[in-house]
Amino acid sequence: MGTLLPPVGSEVFRRFTPSSLNEIQQRQQIKEERKRANAEVSEELFSEPASDLEAGKPLPFIYGEPPHELLNVPLEDMDPFYQSQKTFIVLSKGNVIHRFNAESSLYLLSPFNSMRIFAIKILVHSLFSLFIMATILTNCVFMTLSDPPAWSKTVEYVFTFIYTFEATIKVVSRGFCVGQFTFLKDPWNWLDFMVISMAYLTELVDLGNVSVLRTFRVLRALKTITVIPGLKTIVGALIQSVKKLADAMVLTVFCLSVFALIGLQLFMGNLRQKCVLIPPVVSNLTFEVTNSSHGYFGNDTRGNDTENKDLMFEFEEHINNPDNYYYLAGQRDPLLCGNSSDAGVCPESYICLKVGRNPNYGYTSYDSFGWAFLALFRLMTQDFWENLFQLTLRAAGKTYMIFFVVVIFLGSFYLINLILAVVAMAYAEQNQATMAEAKQKEEEYLHILEALKKREEEQAAWKEALKVQEPHNFEDDHKLCPPCWYAFANVFLKWDCCSCWRHLKRCLSAIVMDPFVDLGITICIILNTIFMAMEHYPMSADFEELLSVGNLVFTGIFTCEMVLKILAMDPYFYFQVGWNIFDSIIVTMSLVELGLANVQGLSVLRSFRLMRVFKLAKSWPTLNMLIKIIGNSVGALGNLTLVLAIIVFIFAVVGMQLFGKNYKDCVCRISEDCKLPRWHMNDFFHAFLIIFRVLCGEWIDTMWDCMEVSGQTMCLIVYMMVLVIGNLVVLNLFLALLLSSFSGDNLAAQDDEGENNLQIAVNRIKRAVAWAKTWILLHLCILTESNHNQHDAVSDEEENRITKNILALTSVTSDQFFKVPIAEAESDSEDSDDDDVDEDKHSRCDESSFCSTVQDPEVKENEADEDNVSKMPMDCWSENCYSRCPSLDIDTSQGKGKVWCNIRRACFIIVENNYFESFIVFMILLSSGALAFEDIYLEKHQLIKTILEYADKVFTYVFVVEMVLKWFAYGFKSYFSNAWCWLDFLIVDVSLVSLTANILGYSELGAIKSLRTLRALRPLRALSRFEGMRVVVNALVGAVPSIFNVLLVCLIFWLIFSIMGVNLFAGKFSYCFNETSQEQFDKKIVNNKTECIALIEANFTEVRWKNLKVNYDNVGIGYLSLLQVATFKGWMEIMYAAVDSRDVESQPIYEVNIYMYLYFVIFIIFGSFFTLNLFIGVIIDNFNQQKAKLGGQDIFMTEEQKKYYNAMKKLGSKKPQKPVPRPENALQGLVFDLVTKQIFDVFIMVLICLNMVTMMVETDEQTKEKEDILYWINVIFIVIFTTECILKTIALRRHYFSIGWNVFDFVVVILSILGLLLADIIEKYFVSPTLFRVIRLARIGRVLRLIRGAKGIRTLLFALMMSLPALFNIGLLLFLIMFIFSIFGMSNFAYVKKEAMIDDMFNFETFGNSMICLFMITTSAGWDGLLSPIMNKPPDCDPDLENPGTTVRGNCGSPAIGIVFFSTYIIMSFLVVVNMYIAIILENFNVATEESSDPLCEDDFDMFYETWEKFDPDATQFIQYSKLSDFCDTLKEPLRIPKPNTIKLISLDLPLVPGDKIHCMDILLALTAEVLGDSDEMDTLKATMEEKFMANNPSKVSYEPISSTLRRKEEEVAARVIQRAYRKYLLQRTVRLASFTYREKTEGWGTKKAPETEGLLCKQFNQLFGNKRETEEPLMSKNDELGQVELQSEVLLHAAPPLNTLELLLGTSERESLV
């Protein structure tokens, strides 16, 4: 770290001079010379720039404060990375680093040129940035003007000049484009360059459409990002998350394309089917109109006479005339209909024909792939999809609800949340990277500080100074204000004038700091909130007076509290506490509001009183925590919010510039009265509202208008950009930030803060109550004793028991609050008592349970078997019952007790029997199913009604019997201590009461009817019987406390907005309405309620003073309004009423109060985005906590172990496959070679893509030629795919069907052929277009084969597959909730008036229709339209209306029941179940991503076994050791070990079995360890995985390794060592012998004795040199035999034949040395 230390003193900051530049040039030359000389340049230390010294960042504190004269001056670069490059830095105010290129700018201006230095000074000056920022903001203001003044052109020139000046300064100071850090090297400057270029281009050249070019000016707003440093970071994060989204986007587009193709095939042309008036002429003709097979009249005409031609002409004109279509009230599109049995039907005298254009200006349809894709995209984003759902079901039939269920659950929930998961993960990764970087910096700085300390310690003179000054400096550093302020504060803000004043302060302090005062203030806050919430419209004068007085009292209390606290604490210390500042602001605002109470328009100040509610956070930990989370998120979201604001601004201006004029010119296309609609882009504010609405997820409605007035292309582009950039990315990042604020630590941290004042006060009260209770009980006992002078054993025992209870109560209550150490004797006695009690209890429990005849309880206890305990009934009653009624405790060993015990045992055996349980489940399902038949048509089907009545009795009796049996079997104690049994008990009670009332003839009573409704809860009994649902319910129940807490906090948040709404809008949503024309009166005719009432009294019966059903007249209905706004359903009507509102009881005027839109914008941000997303955060966090409690596998594993575990988990489930053998037949062999080539698969994939394209080209009502061409193309594709199928079957034979994808291909081909052959037959003989269309869907199956080739998509689909079991359980629970609510709906809303969204198809009349409605509401879609008719009151409905075929009268709903019904369902399904869905997808996506990012993934193991097949064709699981090198080289990365790999493979130490073979598992384990890095702790895991492999592969040969590769190598090395040693020994002998022979020959026969005279070596030597001694000794001696043995051993050692001794003994080098 020493090298990173900054230089000390004047060395730190050095001016950049010509000599500095020369030094850099010299360094560069040295570097280049080294390169030329091929010397390595030592760049390892500084291979990249220091992150702390990046341009734009402040100088690290470690470098110290630069001298003032060196600011804004060129300095030498401090970053070691740049010290050998031509750069210099400039430090501006705040020590911000700016880096420049040291080359001459524009080839003219050197770094030392005064002009360039001046430009640099301007550029880095903080005022210059501020000036540019101000210019941009001013320019933005001018851009928002829809009708700019005449002088704006001049201002535009000024802006252009300023931007040009800025660019010039940048170019002069930095250079243009050559070299580092020049103007164009920064991508953000490209933006400036483009903006300026476009400005000049539009001025100098006439380019036609100026409005399009003017929109480029809006990009100037992006310049704010370049000016504010933090924004660059957040934009970088956004770009990163978009990159990560690539795979998710591809999958989304692919799935949408598939769904769009399905929609195209199923619903093509359906949405053009309308109800057309039957012409009067036709009724007189003999045409069989309704039986026409083609559905319209033209095909029925015969002959060519003129009359028919005229008729034909008139008929065409008639059916294409929109006036002849049937329209519902208030609808601009005609009523759709269908020809299938479950589709929508037309009213009388209307017929269903396919004519005219599609709904919504013709933009909602499935007639071509493009429109189908748009429809499905809309469905996926859930925007106004209820409209598409209703239109499609009305035209095609209710059966197709299945299509929407699949798309909503797979498309909408999965894909949209997958995008959320990806963004959240990208954010989390970035967070981790930032934290890691911060940690690294911290470590670096610590090292630097240590080094600096050492350096300073060397200077002895500084030591004392440091000791004295350090603490003082530390304190001074934390003083934010100048010293004069502290002097002022000490004099004026600390009141310590005299001792009596200080005494008063102490007294006041004791009062105001007392916990009871805090409790009192909290109660006052709650009461004040209740008082504010009681405000409503209309209010009596007395009630208004009461509220006013209450407000004065509370304001007085809070003012008094503030004043007393200020006196007690002194202002200086009072304002140090955040909560006190908050209090003081609210109190001040309340006092100001009282002063300005009568000033018109300032009633909004009353809303500040609502902020008092937040004071509850002081004593409510959850509220405090959630406010902190929101606070933290808002802090982190500061930059993100700014980016969002910039995006909204840019798109609003773009929209205004591109489409504003068109809205004005073509307004008649979208508005009947040719006035601008509420949603338009003619001015900036309305354009902003549209963009905000798109960010809320509502885009399709306004896009239709845009497309109608401005053309389709531009509108689609702009809207899709807003949707993708704004909605999907920014809002998801927003949610990711919110989720990241949640953690278990966050929630747990609250417990560590200790008790607050409120808890202390409550605990004191509890203790006081407990003491009082004890005292009263004790005195009552004494009183009773004195009154009754009977002291028998029973009363003594009773008294002891009471005393014990009192003592127990006392100990419990005191123990709760004080932890007192217990003495040993005390604790022992307590324990022994407890043991005795348990023993007594156990013995009686055994006695009653076992019904044994054995008298001795101890013997009984010893003999009891655990299995028997579980199979015997429990105690019948609880402990208290036995103590109060001793007669209940009967002897079960004899007499009646024994009989009783046997009966209970028999009951127990029955209820524990699986058949009994199955029977009950079957009865529950039957009884639930029976409820579905009780619809409005039941009266017409008397047989079904009678069957249901008898069935109801049977079910009730069965369930009563079951309940009684369980009472007998389990006993009351066990039965009623189980929550599920309680549920059963209550449901059976309801059925029993209902049945009794029916028998007694009271079934028509209102109370009994309501009770009968509760039978809908019967299906809940299924919960305890189905494991999957029970798991989900248990998880939910675990999360209930957290969810309830958040719900409560949301209600508090919403309460503030609701009260504010009541203050702003109470009584202002009413209007005078003309029933005849269905329009509001104009303000000029009727100004207020008084004038409207006068009109009504003047006998105008069609006039009514109406109020909006959902309004802000009180807090309760205000909550409903907010729920509609938060779910974006029905919010338009509320907003329109708000912006049109004037005064109480005044007639509204169009957009008179337009800025009230901002109330809703603020609520949506805080009330919807934040609070509703908190639910997701809480649920995910709660699941993580539950998982931690359960102790999931991964909690006890390190990251390294987790990697091993994942790899081994995948590895253990694999086994080597036997490859498909190549056929011996030559022809089959050729086909086999063809179909197994990769190019063949690629070719088929290309064909599938082409096939998909041809399917996309299909449109409704296409020409005959096009139809024929597409038909034959389809035939060609079917032929090709059939050929592929046949070829593969020929080549692979029976093995073809062993591969899943092949089976899928085969099924698709068969279906395609059937579709082709049966199409004509079906169309001709069975008029069922549905069946025909479904068969055509088989072609889409081919497209799914593309998934096989895409790895990235496979990961995402793997996440879905992992989620499926859990999602299925949630789906079951959701279905159960829907089922129960459907039955409730049928009971309560079956006869509601048909209006809004309740009509002949979507209603609660039948079970099927109810389910359709509830499926729609599951995503909160259209619930406002279903609630609206239910909230009708007379005269909007008729309570006495007779409903044919039933005794039920009236068509009015029940508003209270309706609101509770829909609110409960939305909270349960939308907020809980759907959010659980999201939580599971996020969880599993993380797991899947971890798995895919693991060093080894599934594909790597597949690749291993695919390669193995080639080396082990018989699937023996072994290969020869000699093949190992080739095998490892053939593998792909990361498992591959490329050649030369011999040494590497030896080091793997692979076990060898007889025959020099190695097992596949051993190789794979070794290669896995090689990739992951070997570790000792993994040995056990490896053993486990081997066992798993053995279990998965019973065919695996059990083997005992005889050696290993490493051991084999060691043996070979040892053998070589022995060989060398022996060779050396033989060489020495040979040399001695050769030497002797040479001397003997040169010097004659000497007298010296030969070194060796016997042995094989000597013999061979003599033969070689022709020694005579050889011939003299013809017989072989004993030594020769020994020599022969020597030879054999030597041959073994050398493994070579003994041809020539010298060659045998010596290698080449030895031979040469010997010669």
Swiss-Prot record:
Membrane topology type: Multi-pass membrane protein
IV repeats: 1220-1517
Extent of the II repeats: 497-768
Ribosomal protein among keywords: no
Family of the protein in this entry: Belongs to the sodium channel (TC 1.A.1.10) family. Nav1.4/SCN4A subfamily.
Record InterPro entries: Ion_trans_dom (IPR005821), Na_channel_asu (IPR001696), Na_chnl_inactivation_gate (IPR044564), Na_trans_assoc_dom (IPR010526), VGCC_Ca_Na (IPR043203), Volt_channel_dom_sf (IPR027359)
Ranges occupied by I repeats: 108-431
Gene3D superfamilies the UniProt entry points to: 1.10.287.70, EF-hand (1.10.238.10), iswi atpase (1.20.5.1190), Voltage-gated potassium channels. Chain C (1.20.120.350)
Record field: transmembrane: 127-145, 153-173, 188-205, 212-228, 248-267, 401-421, 516-534, 546-565, 580-599, 602-619, 636-654, 716-734, 916-933, 947-965, 980-998, 1007-1025, 1043-1062, 1155-1176, 1240-1257, 1269-1287, 1300-1317, 1331-1347, 1367-1384, 1459-1481
CDD domains hit by this protein: Na_channel_gate
Function: Pore-forming subunit of a voltage-gated sodium (Nav) channel that directly mediates the depolarizing phase of action potentials in excitable membranes. Navs, also called VGSCs (voltage-gated sodium channels) or VDSCs (voltage-dependent sodium channels), operate by switching between closed and open conformations depending on the voltage difference across the membrane. In the open conformation they allow Na(+) ions to selectively pass through the pore, along their electrochemical gradient.
Disulfide bonds, paired cysteine numbers: 275-337, 346-352, 668-674, 706-715, 1072-1092, 1437-1452
Ranges facing Extracellular side: 146-152, 206-211, 268-368, 394-400, 535-545, 600-601, 655-683, 705-715, 934-946, 999-1006, 1063-1115, 1138-1154, 1258-1268, 1318-1330, 1385-1406, 1430-1458
Free-text note on domains in this protein's UniProt record: The sequence contains 4 internal repeats, each with 5 hydrophobic segments (S1, S2, S3, S5, S6) and one positively charged segment (S4). Segments S4 are probably the voltage-sensors and are characterized by a series of positively charged amino acids at every third position.
Sequence ranges of Acidic residues compositional bias: 825-838
Gene Ontology biological process terms, A to Z: membrane depolarization during action potential; neuronal action potential
GO MF terms, alphabetically ordered: voltage-gated sodium channel activity
Principal location: membrane
Identification of the protein by name: Sodium channel protein type 4 subunit alpha B
Region (Disordered): 824-865
Record's subunit section: Voltage-gated sodium (Nav) channels consist of an ion-conducting alpha subunit which is functional on its own associated with regulatory beta subunits.
